[in-house]
Amino acid sequence: AMGISGQPKALVDLAELAKDTEKGRKLTGRSQVDTRTRAFACYGIGMVAYRSADIDVKTQAFDALKSVMEEANNERNIKVAAINGLSLMNLQSDNASEKEKKLTVDVLACLDKFFDSKAGRGTDLIKSHVPPSIAKLIGRGDSKLHQKYKNDYLKALFPKKKSGNDLYRAAAIALGQLAQAQSELKTDKKYSDGLKKYFENGKDAQARYFALLALGQIGGNENKTYLMKVLSKGNKALERPWAAISLGVMDFLRFEKDKKSAGIDVTLGKLLVKQLKDVKNPEARAAFAVALGLCRYTDAAADIMNMLMKYKSQDELAGYLCIGLSLMNYQPAKTDIHNVVKESVRRPELLKQAAIALGKLGDKTVTTTLTGMLQEKESNLAKLSAIASALGFIGDRRTIQPLKKMLFDDNLTPLSRAFAAVALGGVADKEKLPWNSKIARNMNYRGSVETLTQSG
């Protein structure tokens, strides 16, 4: 919470907690600051740095995280948190001041030092967070610095000696954020070629799929043609779904880049619909539905709606079908998705996905349904969490008063009141996406540690 607030004055206490100092121990009232608190303090430091435009605040945040990185202790939760905290420095690549340029150099040097250290294969999981963090810091480009890292990560895909699988995954993710399409920069063709080569010949399945996704993020007609070939002829259960998501991301980025004149890609839409109908695997179908949503191919809406009615007992598939409809902004789906929400009282994941889909479609009436569910005498933690998350995502200001009333209602269960507070926090958040989306975006989520992927 101290980090989410973005208040620079919180940095002092967050740094003491992260470094497990005497003052930090006094703040916790314990003989030492526990691992979980230290890790979240590191994330908090990164959040403060992200929100501040003051280079001195960013430098103060860096100094604290650098101290954690230089500790001999390699407790993975703490190191992973510090690395991802450093990725949130939010430094300007254009028109940067001399102080900001120096800080960028210092942050990169800190990350490089850890990545290049000879610490044994046991640290591969921790190190795998460095390439995506560096990519997040410097973004896509063609400077000498960008070329250095792109070459480094291309080599990391094909090392002379076998690396840990997490490092292959990290390299693929980073290249997807750093490289440019061949049409934009001819010399970057080798990075897309390297990703294709790894997909075709690489040994780690997850790194192969990340390579496909990276091609979509890089973009360009050559990569699109390649991905459409995989979508048509690849393995049905895994390769085709990853190619579909990659193509969906590519199309979404095209719409974002050219908001006024970008048209619907009918050829891609038809190919995705064919996969949706032909491939029977539920997880694959979920991916195709989301991809169709990202492509805004509303001609597929009727097929997705029919599938939702047929398979609404399959929570994961039904949830993603709802998301797909919302991504393509198919307004006629509101009523049916609202009914899914009402019928999903004991199915928290479907409830959450369907409610978020309605929020994306602009249906504010669902908040009345959700606040009503939150007031029920309920001890199902997953359900309450799903409701609170959905209310926070939708962000309807009209829910503030009923949620405040619930917060102070002694007749409700303590859990209901607690999650009313959680929902209020989400509604009040001035940003469109949840606070942790900055950390989650384009990271190696397969290199997971407890404090990164578990909220409890």
At which residue positions do the language-model features occur?
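Long, helix-rich interaction regions
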Residues: 1-456
